[in-house]
Amino acid sequence: MTACSTTPTTSATSAQPAAGSPLQWHARPSKSDTLPFEGAWSVQAIQELLDKPFMDLMFQAQSVHREHWPAGDIELATLLSVKTGGCPENCGYCPQAAEFDTGVKAEKLMSVDEVTRAAQAAKDAGATRFCMGAAWRAPKDRDIEKMNELIGAVKGLGMQTCATLGMLQPHQAQSLREAGLDYYNHNLDTAPEYYQDVVSTRQYQDRLDTLKAVRGAGISVCCGGIIGMGEAPVHRAGLIAQLANLNPHPESVPINSLVRVPGTPLADSEPVDPLDFVRVIAVARITMPTARVRLSAGRQQLGDAVQALCFMAGANSIFYGDKLLVTGNPDVEADTTLLRKLGLSGTRTSVQE
């Protein structure tokens, strides 16, 4: 496994809460915010990290990173949309929502042969994890059966598998696990108090309920969020608090920079400050020391220099390939060149104790 359940050494920079706490979202942050278990990260503490002098924050994040991960190790993951468009949800950032005019056409679920060919191409290009996304609100049991076939085909190539399919029931998560699924992605997107500004067709607790079902089935969790949706700094701190206080924290944490797609409600959002994005990466590393922190959507708009800072801040995974679901991504040659210039290697290792 890429990031295992190894318990990290507790320190002032990488404290983790005790196991067994329920998944629930925390109250609106305030100076008197009381979190549900001893050792949890408060929103205020995370905000203080985000506000640290940049060089001090980078040093702390890189120090935590080297305590738990080999220097220069970057996981390469590929993401494929196996069922595109037509989603009944109204996520303000997503071009696959049926109600938005973004030019994305609804397509049926891809065949086993199509997915196998795409996975083999990703493996040949150096990817070690293959992620499959389907634009469903909540898959039906018959959809899960079809996904199980795709999971089996990709596992047969010797790759790790990840899926993002929407909200799951516990029995569906168990079925995916029995098919061999390694990771399930279900992002929290933002802080709970800002969530309804982004999407109104579901509740924050719906996300946490699916994460609970995934954990209960024994599937590793991939869960992160999006920066640049008009949120305030406290909402960024609130997102990281939610992620870091999941018990245990996610094995993979994808951090996205909003891709402003014409036709979506968030298309006119102000671009995120690049250094603010790097700060989020650094604090994610400090608060979730054994997670794979993944640079996800929006890497094209960051540029090489900012990506290099993100790697220094503790990012150790990227989505690899020229397309992420329906948005662009740096091509393989560009990523290979960047990693080579930085002396980084696209290999897969486990967390260090």
Swiss-Prot record:
Belongs to the radical SAM superfamily. Biotin synthase family. Homodimer. SMART domains: BATS (SM00876), Elp3 (SM00729). Catalyzes the conversion of dethiobiotin (DTB) to biotin by the insertion of a sulfur atom into dethiobiotin via a radical-based mechanism. [2Fe-2S] cluster binds at C131, C162, C222, R294. Its EC number is 2.8.1.6. Its cofactor is [4Fe-4S] cluster; [2Fe-2S] cluster. [4Fe-4S] cluster binds at C87, C91, C94. Residues 1-30 are annotated as: Disordered. This is Biotin synthase. InterPro entries: Aldolase_TIM (IPR013785), BATS_dom (IPR010722), Biotin_synth/BioAB (IPR002684), Biotin_synthase (IPR024177), Elp3/MiaA/NifB-like_rSAM (IPR006638), rSAM (IPR007197). CDD domains: Radical_SAM (cd01335). Residues 72-299 form the Radical SAM core domain. It catalyses: (4R,5S)-dethiobiotin + (sulfur carrier)-SH + 2 reduced [2Fe-2S]-[ferredoxin] + 2 S-adenosyl-L-methionine = (sulfur carrier)-H + biotin + 2 5'-deoxyadenosine + 2 L-methionine + 2 oxidized [2Fe-2S]-[ferredoxin]. One of its GO terms (biological process) is biotin biosynthetic process. The keyword Protein biosynthesis does not apply. It comes from the Bacteria. Pathway: Cofactor biosynthesis; biotin biosynthesis; biotin from 7,8-diaminononanoate: step 2/2. Keywords: 2Fe-2S, 4Fe-4S, Biotin biosynthesis, Iron, Iron-sulfur, Metal-binding, S-adenosyl-L-methionine, Transferase. SUPFAM superfamilies: Radical SAM enzymes. GO terms for molecular function: 2 iron, 2 sulfur cluster binding; 4 iron, 4 sulfur cluster binding; biotin synthase activity; iron ion binding. Binds 1 [4Fe-4S] cluster. The cluster is coordinated with 3 cysteines and an exchangeable S-adenosyl-L-methionine. Binds 1 [2Fe-2S] cluster. The cluster is coordinated with 3 cysteines and 1 arginine. Residues 1-22 have a biased composition (Low complexity).
